[in-house]
UniProtKB/Swiss-Prot annotation:
<keyword id="KW-0963">Cytoplasm</keyword>
<dbReference type="InterPro" id="IPR000352">
    <property type="entry name" value="Pep_chain_release_fac_I"/>
</dbReference>
<keyword id="KW-0488">Methylation</keyword>
<comment type="similarity">
    <text>Belongs to the prokaryotic/mitochondrial release factor family.</text>
</comment>
<protein>
    <recommendedName>
        <fullName>Peptide chain release factor 1</fullName>
    </recommendedName>
</protein>
<feature type="modified residue" description="N5-methylglutamine">
    <location>
        <position position="239"/>
    </location>
</feature>
<dbReference type="Pfam" id="PF00472">
    <property type="entry name" value="RF-1"/>
</dbReference>
<dbReference type="InterPro" id="IPR045853">
    <property type="entry name" value="Pep_chain_release_fac_I_sf"/>
</dbReference>
<dbReference type="GO" id="GO:0005737">
    <property type="term" value="C:cytoplasm"/>
</dbReference>
<dbReference type="InterPro" id="IPR005139">
    <property type="entry name" value="PCRF"/>
</dbReference>
<dbReference type="Pfam" id="PF03462">
    <property type="entry name" value="PCRF"/>
</dbReference>
<dbReference type="InterPro" id="IPR004373">
    <property type="entry name" value="RF-1"/>
</dbReference>
<comment type="function">
    <text>Peptide chain release factor 1 directs the termination of translation in response to the peptide chain termination codons UAG and UAA.</text>
</comment>
<feature type="region of interest" description="Disordered">
    <location>
        <begin position="289"/>
        <end position="316"/>
    </location>
</feature>
<dbReference type="InterPro" id="IPR050057">
    <property type="entry name" value="Prokaryotic/Mito_RF"/>
</dbReference>
<keyword id="KW-0648">Protein biosynthesis</keyword>
<dbReference type="GO" id="GO:0016149">
    <property type="term" value="F:translation release factor activity, codon specific"/>
</dbReference>
Amino acid sequence: MDASTLLARLEAATASFRNLERQLADPDVAADPTRLEKIARERARLEPLVLDFEELQVLEGEQKQSRELLKECRGDAAMEELAQDDLASLNRRHAELTEKLTVALLPRDPRDERSVMLEIRAGAGGDEACIWAGDLARMYERYSQKLGWNVQPISSNEADLGGFRELILSVKGDSVFSQLKFEAGVHRVQRVPATESQGRVHTSTATVAVMPEADAVEVQLDPKDLEISTARSGGAGGQNVNKVETAVDLLHKPSGIRVFCTQERSQLQNRERALEILRAKLLEQEQREAAARESSDRRAQVGSGDRSEKIRTYNYKDNRTTDHRLGRNFSLDPVLDGQLEDLIGACIAEEQRQKLEALSQQNED
């Protein structure tokens, strides 16, 4: 991004920020909680950008003064050296801020702010794959809890020996998709299963899909396309067990997507949950098809969301987690404990690097 384009975008962002501040002072906005929250969130997103831009402008003034001082010091070796050091320090900070601001102005995924449906499916490996799916679920639950996100299971198919054949978690919070989108793909584990009597290492897999939540306006469903049936659900015990048909089996006939929801206590709640899951699945399917139409370079990027991509291997023997997209290793135990900050942070940095590279190529063209 050239200097004039960067300046124009920063000035536009600052103008938007000032406008949002004026709106927050409007009594009509204060009386509308939904609108107020949306404006406050956008203001909070822009504030660091505006503050950095203000610092950049101050720096440019200091650079000008430093260059003038350097001219005045010609002939005084000691003063000239001090002035050169000062100018070099200012130039370094200016370069750092310019890069930071350029990254902040890169095109944003409009889905980044959304909550998600996190689907984990056992893959190859039989019972051990189901147990591994359960381990991944705990990893994401711990990570989400550390960030203050709300995590709830909304659909599950438990395995006989522990874990899950399939599990869908609702993860609600600020900018959930912006981080968890990097988890989509095949997660492979290499370890000795608890059921292995010979001590042999087995390789099992689980697939993670990260689906941004979709509302009823964004994904409209035709009732004629839906086939809904009910079944008995275990419930919470006592008289409700296996006596009331609260479970909902939902089939979307055009896509063949089926959703079975049993987590809620009433049939109406399970029906709403099933429709929520279906909308998220249909939106994700539409986005995957759109991505498939793009170039292979785009699909290879970090965070592309390809659920068939083998993204990570968890090796218990060596206490190592390898992210194949990054070509980097991380300590296994902290990762399984939900300490994903370094790993996801590295994915975000790589995505930004790829975007900057693409932007640079566009400028050259």
